[in-house]
A protein has these predicted regions:
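Catalytic cores of DNA base-excision repair glycosylases
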Residues: 1-151, 155-168, 181
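Residues in intrinsically disordered, low-complexity segments of regulatory proteins
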Residues: 23, 111, 184-187, 196, ...
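Generic structural motif recognizing short loop/turn segments at the entrances and edges of beta-strands
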Residues: 166, 194-195, 209
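Conserved small/polar residues in nucleotide/adenosyl-binding loops
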Residues: 207-214
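Conserved N-terminal beta-strand and adjoining loop/helix that marks the start
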Residues: 171-196
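Beta-strand scaffold of nucleotide-dependent catalytic cores
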Residues: 197-201
């Protein structure tokens, strides 16, 4: 339904945000829909409706960070640029037994440099999409965070973490995320005739039962 309603970047850019969010229901976080809408508007306004073809320009679009921009450029245009999402960080850190603490910006920058040096150098239109996809798939399916399937790994012979006998020690990241909890109330108000009171949420612009939190956000 989403693609039927917005078949082109121009169609998405011209649509009201309410329409975009309504059709996004069930497709993921609404922040992604808002970024997608802003991105489409930016592509139309700054690039004449044609997506830029370099990672550097792609990264200037709303909602697109360095790794996503590089992935698009590598897959679509064969550009020689590295990605460094969670899966790739884990794969490279284990293969290299990388001792840098990825909670520190300096260590992450150094890993970016290493990832770039390891990129293919020939026949980039074919090798860059394949290499990029291979790293992502390896991290998602075999080189998992807690139970890496080392016996089936195609780069086992190259993996310094495996040779050390402790691949799960990598990547090193000292910062621990603090978890928090929140209690929310949702009001269900119905008239005698069966009508239900709905209010528009200020964040996602969709209609739902009112919540005390809505007042704080409006």
């Amino acid at each position: 339904r989403f693609l039927d309603r917005f078949p082109t970047v121009a169609d998405l850019a011209a649509a009201p945000l309410d329409d975009v969010l309504a059709l996004w229901a069930g497709l993921g976080y609404y922040s992604r829909a808002r970024n997608l809408h802003r991105c489409a508007q930016d592509v139309v306004a700054r690039f004449g409706g044609e997506f830029p073809r370099s990672a550097e320009q792609l990264e200037t679009l709303p909602g697109i960070g360095r790794s996503t921009a590089s992935a698009v450029a590598a897959f679509c245009f064969g550009e020689r640029v590295a990605i460094l999402d969670g899966n790739v960080k884990r794969v490279l850190s284990r293969v290299l037994a990388y001792e840098g603490d990825l909670a520190q910006a300096r260590a992450t920058r150094a890993l970016w440099d290493i990832a770039t040096r390891l990129l293919p150098r020939e026949n980039l239109a074919r090798t860059m999409p394949a290499y990029t996809q291979a790293q992502m798939d390896l991290g998602a399916t075999l080189c998992t965070p807690k139970r890496p399937d080392c016996p089936r790994c195609p780069v086992q012979d190259l993996c310094a973490g495996y040779r050390l006998g402790e691949p799960t020690r990598f990547p090193i990241k000292s910062r621990v995320l603090k978890r928090s909890s929140q209690t929310l109330w949702l009001l269900w108000l119905r008239r005698a005739d069966g009508a239900v009171w709905l209010s528009q949420r200020p964040v996602c612009l969709l209609y739902t039962s009112p919540s005390p939190r809505d007042k704080r956000q409006s």
